[in-house]
Amino acid sequence: MSENWLFRDKDGNPFMPIGVQAHNSSTGSPFIRKALRTLELFGGNTLEAPTYWYFVEPEEGVYDFSSVKDLIDEVREAGAHLVILWFGMSKNGHPNYVPEYVKLHPEIYHVAKGHDGRAVASLSPHCMATLERDKAAFLALLQFVKDYDEKERTVIAIQIENEMGYANTDRDYSEEAEADYQKAVPEEIAGLRFPDMWGEEASDGQAAGEGNCDNAVQQKICDAGNGKPGDENENAGVVSPWKTAFGRYSHEAFSAWYTAQYIEKIAKAGKALYDIPFYTNVFIGENAHEEAGLCYNAGAGVSRMLELWKIAAPSLDLIAPDIYNTSLYDYRRICASYKRFGNPLFVPESPVSGMPNAMNLILAAGEFEAQGVASFGAEGALDENENLNPESEEIALSMHIIAKIAPLLIQYHGTGRIHAFTQEEFEPWRYLKLPLHHVVMRYTSCNSQGFGYTTDVKSKEGRKKIARRGRAILVQTGDYEFYLCGAGAMAEFIRRPDPMDEDSYGKMSSRYSSQLNFLSVDEGHFENGEFVCDFRRNGDETNFAQYVLDGQLIRIRLNPCVE
């Protein structure tokens, strides 16, 4: 339902960001123009683009927001919206975009240490000096955005940092961090449990961190944890309270808490200055062996740590997964994981090319009701003539589909009336059971017919449309009214028998006749939230199935009186 929608336009209306993200170093007009060209070809409405700490604060305490002004102006002139990506102390866990005064003074702005005591390529969130300078620069940026854009609201959200966490270590082993590791686990998270943290599932009634030991491994750790922390050498033999609380995930939970708290301090101060949606993006944990520091940034808001992050950083409006996984299995579990604990799903990064993501974007928007989607590397979608590369055409088609039906995705969010269909390998059709109707979504690549279309499906272009991999989003807006948007798909509706009807088979046979089954089928678009009919289908174009070949949006009104 729209009242639960996070993103809003300047009039306060719910808004679904659909778009692209510029490359990391895409700053300046030529690069942004190319990104906006891709956005146009994708049918999107929102550009995500970075702003760099070292650019806006070249010297300590000296700020220059001319690049931010130029960025807002170009996006506004294009009639689009903007999500600013704050590249502060972290870009994929690395300090690439910090000012030189930070890089040149590691004695002040501490670099994290690995388990061998050597520096790793990440700044430490335990360092308050780094936090205070990062926060000051972010607040200065936020003040500029508020002063320059609050009325127009071209900027609809700000991403704080980029894929936070440690690269190449599971936690910070510096002296500063070691002292924190020996402190008590914060009460807010002491009762959390993570699956398999003791090598087997804890009993349902047992929460971690309550001082109880529910298996031999935990008992051994609890017994060892009775020592008192002393100097650094003594600490080497002392078990941290984090270990007794979280077992095998103690280092990851420790890193996640301090990383999330770092962002929380920035976000909380930001909310007091300008109430605009804040989120952070995540280098997700669903990678390879799924071990922190090896397969993803330790301390990140991965699905395993999502509940901890939501507790530690309540000023963030959402925690967003960057999803580059192509497998359907992975994609579904990632989307489901990030819809927990009151966290809205938003996918700020995904591939800009390839059939897998073209299918997965439909699932994100339809099945998992994401509040926004975007593809990374906008400029890479264009050829030398600034037309779409063939590899990006299917992504663009899926973005167009989502954009056309977005008003209904917002209106019917969370109602159970939104259904996504994506054609899996070897799949000719899919069945959906609704309270009053059977729905069969057939995919034209496996159910082709040479009639019943307004397109000449025997032409080269027509054959291409028929053969494409099917995808669609179906929204039920009434007992007998549906909207369908997609490509390579055609829907059949049959009213289900009444429970007490003795002649159910006879009526089912009659209802199978499409000629009797509908009142109207209109092809159209939404304008200011209202559906506008561009073309009314009838006769051959409705008698066999209700089809969408290349991104059409149709409204289907079924006949409630068919017998």
Set out the residue ranges of the language-model regions:
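Aromatic-lined substrate-binding rim segments of carbohydrate-active enzymes
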Residues: 32-106, 259-273
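Aromatic- and carboxylate-lined catalytic core of secreted/periplasmic carbohydrate-active enzymes
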Residues: 362-498
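Short, acidic/polar
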Residues: 25-41, 296-312, 331, 358-361
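N-terminal carbohydrate-binding accessory modules
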Residues: 1-45
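The substrate-binding groove and active-site-proximal loops of carbohydrate-active enzymes
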Residues: 17-28, 50-68, 116-136, 148, ...
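Polysaccharide-binding and catalytic clefts of secreted carbohydrate-active enzymes
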Residues: 108-306
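Catalytic-core region of carbohydrate-active enzymes that cleave or remodel glycosidic bonds
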Residues: 265-275, 304-409
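C-terminal beta-sandwich/jelly-roll accessory domains of carbohydrate-active enzymes
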Residues: 455-466, 481-563
